[in-house]
Amino acid sequence: MAAKEIVFDQKARDAILKGVNTLADAVKVTLGPKGRNVVIEKSFGSPTITKDGVTVAKEIELENKFENMGAQMVKEVASKTSDVAGDGTTTATVLAQAIYREGSKLVAAGHNPMDVKRGIDKAVEAIVGELKKLSKPTKDHKEIAQVGIISANGDTTIGNIIAEAMEKVGKEGVITVEEAKGLETTLDVVEGMQFDRGYLSPYFVTDAERMEAVLEDAYILINEKKISNMKDLLPLLEQIARSGKPLIIVAEEVEGEALATLVVNKLRGTLHVCAVKAPGFGDRRKAMLEDIAILTGGRMIAEELGLKLEQVTLKDLGRAKRVTVDKDNTTIVDGAGKKEDIEARVKTIRAQIEETTSDYDREKLQERLAKLVGGVAVINVGAATETEMKEKKARVEDALHATRAAVEEGIVPGGGVAYLRCVKALEGVKVNEGEKVGLDIVRRAIEEPLRQISGNGGYEGSIVVNKVKEAKEAAFGFNAATGEYEDLVKAGVIDPTKVSRSALQNAASVASLMLTTMAMVAEKPKEESAAPAGGGMGGMGGMGGMM
């Protein structure tokens, strides 16, 4: 085991502070509408230019191991806030730096770190409670767009496209971000349920020009197992032929004789039919087939449910107004499922989302939920160069997260003003003498985001903070984009409550951990031994006889 280097007490806290300051100073220049850019070197390709705090934070590694630990802990604040709320990473970094900087001075002056920590925790709890009181739900398309615009660093196109996507697919809908082929940023919305499986044979196509099969007012057979034997299907196909309606078969596989017979009947015009492979694998496939069955009002044909293919009648089949199948995707629009059945299914999936610990499972469950209730929207991000594309795509993803957070927990006035309006909540907090120090640290730290936003815009932070503090209206603040003092909510400068809350909670959590640090342990750097001098290649003589 390699030897370790250990530092204690003040020396440890000073090293942490140096690391925290290095990282925070690089990140905080990006805060606010007039924030500056940071250029990050890449080992290959062009450098990345960004105004996103967490992207800058992730790139920073310091040479000194103890300072690096401080930087990494603040990096954790930024990425945790980004994971939970999608935005507010720079604000969280600024708050963590302010709390730790003030706190380390007071601990050095002899205050008990544990008292200071308790004071910080009580102050944060009071401010979070006040933020929730200040919060208002998002009312309309315009407010959602404003949240998106602010999170996308003032890009109105992105804000409006996100608001439109949210409107089309609803709160539960899935919105994905893709790279577009051209320069334009566009929105595609898929109505109904779509899954990524196409037709099993191109002979099922009804529209040869677009190479897709469109089945209007169709029956849907949902079968869990393979279908290869024709005689199992025959009784059902006779009933379908008599009804004159089209049929779509969704099964694990349709092959051999069964597929050939379906194709022949389709080409003859006896049956209007299309076969599709079931989506997903294993248990997830079963769950998705159940979803399709509930959405279309049919039953999943599975032997474990006591249902055999030869016994199926028309009433076991699902119905849909329209099914469109191309070579890669199947879309079911307007399924005939009962509203209460779909709602019960949605409730079950929501419960599973709450319980699951796997991010991958959660994502898949959310996709299933979206397909049942809303639909899927795809934002295609267009840009002129690859560098711009990377930066723009990251901004769209941030803005999307922030708008979701706003819909979830509501909005508060932006521009760092909401924190100032919560100071009054600290008056009634019961603390002892030692904890009061922690309370005062938070009181000063929550002014820091507004100071930084003003400073980045070229204004004097302290003057701005005092002017905003004097105002009585909650929404009155400083709009750094225009340089005006005004009602920020009306001006569209708003933050999701979840973002403001997470930023403060995460910053205080990590800063108070760092304040109570008494020792740091790191590996000693290995001393590089000098390379031995290179000698000649002895013993190579006498090779003349090899001719």
Curated annotation (Swiss-Prot):
Listed EC numbers: 5.6.1.7
Amino-acid positions noted as binding ATP in the UniProt annotation, renumbered to this chain: 30-33, 51, 87-91, 415, 479-481, 495
SUPFAM superfamilies: GroEL apical domain-like (SSF52029), GroEL equatorial domain-like (SSF48592), GroEL-intermediate domain like (SSF54849)
Region (Disordered): 525-547
GO terms classed as biological process: protein refolding
Catalytic activity: ATP + H2O + a folded polypeptide = ADP + phosphate + an unfolded polypeptide
Pfam families documented for this protein: Cpn60_TCP1
A single Gene Ontology CC term: cytoplasm
Subcellular location: Cytoplasm
One term of GO molecular function: unfolded protein binding
Alphabetic keyword roster: ATP-binding, Chaperone, Cytoplasm, Isomerase, Nucleotide-binding
Catalytic class of the enzyme: isomerase
Comp. bias (Gly residues): 533-547
Family, as annotated: Belongs to the chaperonin (HSP60) family.
Function: Together with its co-chaperonin GroES, plays an essential role in assisting protein folding. The GroEL-GroES system forms a nano-cage that allows encapsulation of the non-native substrate proteins and provides a physical environment optimized to promote and accelerate protein folding.
Subunit composition and interactions: Forms a cylinder of 14 subunits composed of two heptameric rings stacked back-to-back. Interacts with the co-chaperonin GroES.
NCBIfam families in alphabetical order: GroEL (TIGR02348), PRK00013.1 (NF000592), PRK12849.1 (NF009487), PRK12850.1 (NF009488), PRK12851.1 (NF009489)
Name of the protein this chain belongs to: Chaperonin GroEL 2
Lineage, broadest ranks: Bacteria, Pseudomonadati, Myxococcota, Myxococcia, Myxococcales
Gene transcribed to yield this protein: groEL2
